[in-house]
Amino acid sequence: MNRLLPCLLILLLSGCVRLPGPGPAVTYHVLTDPGPVAMSPSTHPGILLVREMDAPALYQAASPVYSREAGTRSYYQYARWSEPPAKRLTWLLRQRLEAARVFAVVSPLGAGVRGDYQLNTRLVD
């Protein structure tokens, strides 16, 4: 009986413990370019190489960053980027430049193409 009482007490108390349920759903955000493309009045005859955008380490994470007061940054807990912002913004920029026909050819840097111009960009906050 002395052994049975602690076991029953543990069994009863374990029924009071609430197991965590599924957490909030994670939301994925995709950066898009909804604006219309303005055509260039003239196309430059060169090849433009677009280097992947530089970004501080804070903005290379999978979670979006927010700030509630100056000098502080935090990550959203239940939100994610579909891909790193710098990579996605570089792709959107390249698509926009190709569609606007500013240069005869727009190519990513490192694609094995010899270019006449190189565009370097940086993400700043």
State what each model feature region is:
Residues 6, 55, 98:
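Residue-level marker of positions within ordered structural domains that often coincide
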Residues 17-86:
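A structural "domain/chain start" motif
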Residues 17-39, 75, 95, 99-125:
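Surface-exposed short loop/turn segments
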Residues 2-10:
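Sec-dependent signal peptide recognition
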